[in-house]
């Protein structure tokens, strides 16, 4: 085993990477509330894992969406548990994200030189809420359908461009298959990709600048 390790160590400098990760300075004022960002990240990983598992059974069509969710809940082994964990962790992720934003704001973690870290965090917060809005509609039951109709109808109040935004969100004048396809694409591809990109930037800046000091 030592020869295998030495082979990788010679090429990748694994020990140097491990030392850099393990020797990062942690200020003495850090408490349990500074773990909220990590908790949010952990819940995001749970969302990815359970969401990926559900894509094997979910069918994003207005005719089959509800039936596929019902099949997952009643016939698939542990399907009810996977969906329940997805739903519970989604609620917990939103809560931990809100608490994390509040902690950063109240402790002044958004101030110079960490403005970009704050901006990427706010963008991820918007993505998190968008996850909830798009995911809520995917079962395409009565609650999901009317939620989509109301949410996508809100921009209609904007002068001039409002109707165009509504049509863009819905994929047409009314709510239907195009709307479900758009929301499914946003929920499973666009939003996860954006979140991962800004999350990497967020983490890199935290590693570079460290944790902000006490007030």
From Swiss-Prot:
It comes from the Eukaryota. The chain crosses the membrane at residues 32-52, 90-110, 116-136, 186-206. It is found in: Plastid, Chloroplast thylakoid membrane. Heme b 1 binds at residues 100, 202. GO terms for biological process: photosynthesis; respiratory electron transport chain. Disulfide bonds: none annotated. Its cofactor is heme b; heme c. Signal peptide: none annotated. Keywords: Chloroplast, Electron transport, Heme, Iron, Membrane, Metal-binding, Photosynthesis, Plastid, Thylakoid, Transmembrane, Transmembrane helix, Transport. GO terms for molecular function: electron transporter, transferring electrons within cytochrome b6/f complex of photosystem II activity; metal ion binding; oxidoreductase activity. InterPro entries: Cyt_b/b6_N, Cyt_B6_PetB, Cytb/b6-like_sf, Cytochrome_b_N_euk/bac, Di-haem_cyt_TM. Pfam families: Cytochrome_B. Binds 2 heme b groups non-covalently with two histidine residues as axial ligands. Coiled coil: none annotated. Heme c binds at residue 35. Belongs to the cytochrome b family. PetB subfamily. Component of the cytochrome b6-f complex, which mediates electron transfer between photosystem II (PSII) and photosystem I (PSI), cyclic electron flow around PSI, and state transitions. Heme 1 (or BH or b566) is high-potential and absorbs at about 566 nm, and heme 2 (or BL or b562) is low-potential and absorbs at about 562 nm. This is Cytochrome b6. It comes from Tupiella akineta.
